[in-house]
Protein backbone atom coordinates (compact mmCIF):
# COMPACT_ATOMS: atom_id res chain seq x y z
CA UNK A 1 0.00 0.00 0.00
CA UNK A 2 1.37 3.37 -0.95
CA UNK A 3 1.62 5.77 1.97
CA UNK A 4 2.10 9.47 1.36
CA UNK A 5 4.46 9.99 4.28
CA UNK A 6 6.90 7.38 3.01
CA UNK A 7 6.65 8.75 -0.50
CA UNK A 8 7.84 12.02 1.01
CA UNK A 9 10.64 10.12 2.70
CA UNK A 10 11.79 8.60 -0.58
CA UNK A 11 11.77 11.95 -2.40
CA UNK A 12 13.49 13.76 0.45
CA UNK A 13 16.23 11.16 0.51
CA UNK A 14 17.16 11.97 -3.08
CA UNK A 15 17.66 15.65 -2.30
CA UNK A 16 19.53 14.89 0.89
CA UNK A 17 22.19 12.76 -0.78
CA UNK A 18 24.24 15.75 -1.82
CA UNK A 19 24.82 16.80 1.76
CA UNK A 20 25.26 13.41 3.40
CA UNK A 21 28.35 12.62 5.39
CA UNK A 22 30.46 9.52 4.96
CA UNK A 23 28.66 6.56 6.50
CA UNK A 24 30.74 4.62 8.99
CA UNK A 25 30.38 0.88 9.28
CA UNK A 26 28.43 0.18 12.48
CA UNK A 27 28.26 -3.33 13.92
CA UNK A 28 25.57 -3.90 16.54
CA UNK A 29 25.09 -7.35 18.05
CA UNK A 30 24.09 -6.46 21.60
CA UNK A 31 22.95 -3.62 23.86
CA UNK A 32 26.57 -2.97 24.77
CA UNK A 33 27.36 -2.16 21.13
CA UNK A 34 24.95 0.79 21.30
CA UNK A 35 27.18 2.66 23.73
CA UNK A 36 29.17 5.50 22.18
CA UNK A 37 26.95 5.54 19.09
CA UNK A 38 24.91 8.46 17.82
CA UNK A 39 21.32 7.21 18.15
CA UNK A 40 18.12 8.76 16.84
CA UNK A 41 14.65 8.61 18.36
CA UNK A 42 11.32 10.44 18.30
CA UNK A 43 11.12 13.24 20.84
CA UNK A 44 9.10 12.42 23.93
CA UNK A 45 8.97 8.67 23.34
CA UNK A 46 10.10 5.55 25.20
CA UNK A 47 13.06 5.32 22.83
CA UNK A 48 14.29 8.74 23.92
CA UNK A 49 13.94 7.81 27.59
CA UNK A 50 15.80 4.54 27.02
CA UNK A 51 18.75 6.26 25.36
CA UNK A 52 18.98 8.92 28.05
CA UNK A 53 18.69 6.55 31.01
CA UNK A 54 20.18 3.25 29.82
CA UNK A 55 22.84 4.36 27.33
CA UNK A 56 24.73 7.14 29.14
CA UNK A 57 27.64 7.09 26.71
CA UNK A 58 25.50 7.27 23.58
CA UNK A 59 24.56 10.55 21.91
CA UNK A 60 20.79 11.02 21.90
CA UNK A 61 19.41 12.72 18.77
CA UNK A 62 15.71 13.55 19.14
CA UNK A 63 13.62 14.07 16.01
CA UNK A 64 10.09 15.32 15.40
CA UNK A 65 9.14 11.98 13.84
CA UNK A 66 10.56 8.70 12.62
CA UNK A 67 10.69 9.98 9.03
CA UNK A 68 13.27 12.62 9.90
CA UNK A 69 15.23 10.11 11.98
CA UNK A 70 15.23 7.66 9.06
CA UNK A 71 16.62 10.28 6.69
CA UNK A 72 19.46 11.03 9.09
CA UNK A 73 20.24 7.33 9.43
CA UNK A 74 20.26 6.79 5.67
CA UNK A 75 22.52 9.81 5.17
CA UNK A 76 25.01 8.73 7.83
CA UNK A 77 24.29 11.56 10.28
CA UNK A 78 23.38 9.03 12.99
CA UNK A 79 24.31 5.40 13.55
CA UNK A 80 21.02 3.85 14.64
CA UNK A 81 17.42 4.53 15.65
CA UNK A 82 15.51 3.19 18.65
CA UNK A 83 11.78 3.09 17.96
CA UNK A 84 8.68 0.93 18.45
CA UNK A 85 8.60 -2.35 16.54
CA UNK A 86 5.68 -1.82 14.14
CA UNK A 87 6.68 1.67 12.98
CA UNK A 88 10.20 0.26 12.53
CA UNK A 89 8.80 -2.46 10.26
CA UNK A 90 7.04 0.17 8.15
CA UNK A 91 10.28 2.15 7.83
CA UNK A 92 12.29 -0.88 6.73
CA UNK A 93 9.54 -2.09 4.40
CA UNK A 94 9.95 1.15 2.48
CA UNK A 95 13.75 1.39 2.77
CA UNK A 96 15.60 -1.72 1.66
CA UNK A 97 18.94 -0.36 2.91
CA UNK A 98 17.75 -0.43 6.54
CA UNK A 99 17.16 -3.39 8.83
CA UNK A 100 15.76 -4.14 12.31
CA UNK A 101 17.62 -5.61 15.27
CA UNK A 102 15.68 -7.00 18.24
CA UNK A 103 17.96 -6.66 21.26
CA UNK A 104 15.31 -7.10 23.99
CA UNK A 105 15.63 -3.47 25.04
CA UNK A 106 12.31 -2.74 26.73
CA UNK A 107 8.61 -3.51 26.34
CA UNK A 108 5.79 -1.08 26.98
CA UNK A 109 2.01 -0.80 26.72
CA UNK A 110 -0.03 1.75 24.82
CA UNK A 111 -3.05 3.43 26.39
CA UNK A 112 -5.35 6.35 25.62
CA UNK A 113 -4.86 9.50 27.69
CA UNK A 114 -7.59 11.84 28.93
CA UNK A 115 -7.44 14.96 31.05
CA UNK A 116 -7.07 14.19 34.74
CA UNK A 117 -10.46 13.83 36.39
CA UNK A 118 -12.43 13.23 33.18
CA UNK A 119 -13.88 9.97 34.48
CA UNK A 120 -16.94 10.08 32.22
CA UNK A 121 -14.85 9.95 29.05
CA UNK A 122 -12.33 7.54 30.57
CA UNK A 123 -15.04 5.07 31.59
CA UNK A 124 -16.60 5.27 28.12
CA UNK A 125 -13.23 4.63 26.44
CA UNK A 126 -12.51 1.66 28.69
CA UNK A 127 -15.93 0.19 27.88
CA UNK A 128 -15.35 0.62 24.15
CA UNK A 129 -11.95 -1.10 24.35
CA UNK A 130 -13.43 -3.97 26.38
CA UNK A 131 -16.37 -4.35 23.98
CA UNK A 132 -14.06 -4.34 20.95
CA UNK A 133 -11.97 -7.14 22.43
CA UNK A 134 -15.11 -9.14 23.21
CA UNK A 135 -17.02 -8.75 19.93
CA UNK A 136 -14.09 -9.24 17.55
CA UNK A 137 -13.62 -5.67 16.32
CA UNK A 138 -10.23 -5.41 18.01
CA UNK A 139 -8.93 -8.56 16.30
CA UNK A 140 -10.32 -7.28 13.02
CA UNK A 141 -8.35 -4.03 13.34
CA UNK A 142 -5.20 -6.00 14.16
CA UNK A 143 -5.72 -8.08 11.02
CA UNK A 144 -6.30 -4.95 8.92
CA UNK A 145 -3.39 -2.83 10.17
CA UNK A 146 -0.89 -5.49 11.23
CA UNK A 147 -1.28 -8.23 8.60
CA UNK A 148 1.31 -10.98 8.27
CA UNK A 149 1.79 -10.17 4.58
CA UNK A 150 2.31 -6.47 5.31
CA UNK A 151 -0.57 -5.38 3.07
CA UNK A 152 -2.57 -2.98 5.22
CA UNK A 153 -6.30 -2.62 4.59
CA UNK A 154 -8.13 0.45 5.85
CA UNK A 155 -11.55 -0.64 7.15
CA UNK A 156 -14.72 1.30 6.44
CA UNK A 157 -16.15 2.29 9.82
CA UNK A 158 -19.45 4.12 9.92
CA UNK A 159 -19.16 7.54 11.54
CA UNK A 160 -22.38 7.98 13.46
CA UNK A 161 -23.77 11.50 13.73
CA UNK A 162 -23.10 12.91 17.17
CA UNK A 163 -24.08 15.74 19.44
CA UNK A 164 -21.01 17.95 19.15
CA UNK A 165 -17.46 16.85 18.45
CA UNK A 166 -14.70 15.02 20.30
CA UNK A 167 -11.10 15.77 19.33
CA UNK A 168 -8.41 13.11 19.24
CA UNK A 169 -4.84 14.40 19.43
CA UNK A 170 -2.13 12.41 17.68
CA UNK A 171 1.15 12.57 15.76
CA UNK A 172 0.31 11.16 12.34
CA UNK A 173 3.77 9.82 11.49
CA UNK A 174 3.65 6.55 13.41
CA UNK A 175 2.35 3.82 11.10
CA UNK A 176 0.43 1.59 11.35
CA UNK A 177 -1.13 3.33 14.37
CA UNK A 178 -1.52 6.79 12.81
CA UNK A 179 -0.34 8.11 9.47
CA UNK A 180 -1.52 10.16 6.50
CA UNK A 181 -3.13 8.42 3.53
CA UNK A 182 -4.07 10.92 0.85
CA UNK A 183 -5.62 13.79 2.80
CA UNK A 184 -6.86 11.69 5.73
CA UNK A 185 -5.30 10.56 8.99
CA UNK A 186 -5.78 6.81 9.24
CA UNK A 187 -4.39 3.92 11.24
CA UNK A 188 -5.21 1.53 14.07
CA UNK A 189 -5.63 4.32 16.61
CA UNK A 190 -7.75 6.43 14.27
CA UNK A 191 -10.06 3.49 13.59
CA UNK A 192 -10.38 2.71 17.28
CA UNK A 193 -11.06 6.39 17.96
CA UNK A 194 -14.01 6.27 15.56
CA UNK A 195 -15.57 3.51 17.65
CA UNK A 196 -14.85 5.56 20.79
CA UNK A 197 -16.54 8.63 19.31
CA UNK A 198 -19.55 6.62 18.15
CA UNK A 199 -20.05 5.12 21.60
CA UNK A 200 -19.62 8.51 23.27
CA UNK A 201 -22.20 10.10 20.98
CA UNK A 202 -19.83 12.61 19.41
CA UNK A 203 -18.45 13.37 15.96
CA UNK A 204 -14.75 12.50 15.72
CA UNK A 205 -12.19 15.13 14.76
CA UNK A 206 -8.46 14.34 14.61
CA UNK A 207 -5.78 16.94 15.36
CA UNK A 208 -2.22 16.22 14.18
CA UNK A 209 0.62 17.76 16.19
CA UNK A 210 4.10 17.09 17.56
CA UNK A 211 4.15 14.09 19.88
CA UNK A 212 5.86 15.95 22.70
CA UNK A 213 3.14 18.62 22.61
CA UNK A 214 0.19 16.27 23.03
CA UNK A 215 -0.08 16.29 26.82
CA UNK A 216 0.09 20.09 26.97
CA UNK A 217 -2.68 20.26 24.37
CA UNK A 218 -4.78 17.86 26.43
CA UNK A 219 -4.28 19.87 29.61
CA UNK A 220 -5.20 23.11 27.84
CA UNK A 221 -8.42 21.63 26.49
CA UNK A 222 -7.38 21.87 22.83
CA UNK A 223 -8.00 18.13 22.47
CA UNK A 224 -10.18 15.68 24.39
CA UNK A 225 -8.02 12.56 24.34
CA UNK A 226 -4.70 11.27 23.04
CA UNK A 227 -4.42 8.17 20.87
CA UNK A 228 -0.88 8.13 19.56
CA UNK A 229 0.83 4.88 20.47
CA UNK A 230 1.53 6.54 23.82
CA UNK A 231 3.15 4.49 26.57
CA UNK A 232 1.43 4.71 29.94
CA UNK A 233 4.46 5.67 32.03
CA UNK A 234 4.36 6.66 35.69
CA UNK A 235 5.74 10.09 34.81
CA UNK A 236 2.90 10.73 32.37
CA UNK A 237 0.34 9.47 34.89
CA UNK A 238 1.17 12.49 37.01
CA UNK A 239 -0.35 14.69 34.30
CA UNK A 240 -3.03 12.56 32.61
CA UNK A 241 -5.34 9.63 33.29
CA UNK A 242 -4.81 6.55 31.14
CA UNK A 243 -7.27 4.00 29.84
CA UNK A 244 -6.75 0.29 30.16
CA UNK A 245 -3.87 -0.81 27.88
CA UNK A 246 -4.84 -1.68 24.32
CA UNK A 247 -1.51 -2.78 22.81
CA UNK A 248 1.86 -4.11 23.98
CA UNK A 249 4.94 -3.10 22.02
CA UNK A 250 8.72 -3.32 22.26
CA UNK A 251 11.59 -1.07 21.33
CA UNK A 252 13.85 -2.21 18.51
CA UNK A 253 16.92 -0.84 16.76
CA UNK A 254 17.13 0.22 13.12
CA UNK A 255 20.55 0.27 11.46
CA UNK A 256 21.93 0.47 7.95
CA UNK A 257 22.59 -2.84 6.27
Q: At which residue positions do the language-model features occur?
A:
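C-terminal motif of bacterial Sec signal peptides marking the signal peptidase cleavage site
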Residues: 15-19
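Acidic, polar ligand-binding/catalytic clefts
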Residues: 22-33, 95-106, 116, 194, ...
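Short helix-initiation/N-cap motifs at beta->coil->alpha
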Residues: 24-27, 43-46, 61-75, 108, ...
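Short loop->beta-strand "edge-of-pocket" segments that line small-molecule binding or catalytic clefts
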Residues: 31-44, 166-170
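Ligand-binding clefts/hinges and TM-proximal coupling segments of bilobed small-molecule sensing domains
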Residues: 46-55, 100-104, 126-164
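Short, polar/charged alpha-helical segment
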Residues: 49-52, 181-201
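Periplasmic-binding protein-like
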Residues: 85, 89-126, 152-155, 172, ...
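Short glycine-rich His-centered loop
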Residues: 164-187
Amino acid sequence: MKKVLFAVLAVSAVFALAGCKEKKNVVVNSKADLENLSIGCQAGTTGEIYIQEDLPNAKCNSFKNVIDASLSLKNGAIDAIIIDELPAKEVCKNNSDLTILDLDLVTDVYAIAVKKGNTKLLNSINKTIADMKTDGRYESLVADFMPADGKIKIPAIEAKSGNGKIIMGTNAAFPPFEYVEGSKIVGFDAAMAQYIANDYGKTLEISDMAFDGLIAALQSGSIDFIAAGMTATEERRQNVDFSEPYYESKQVVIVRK
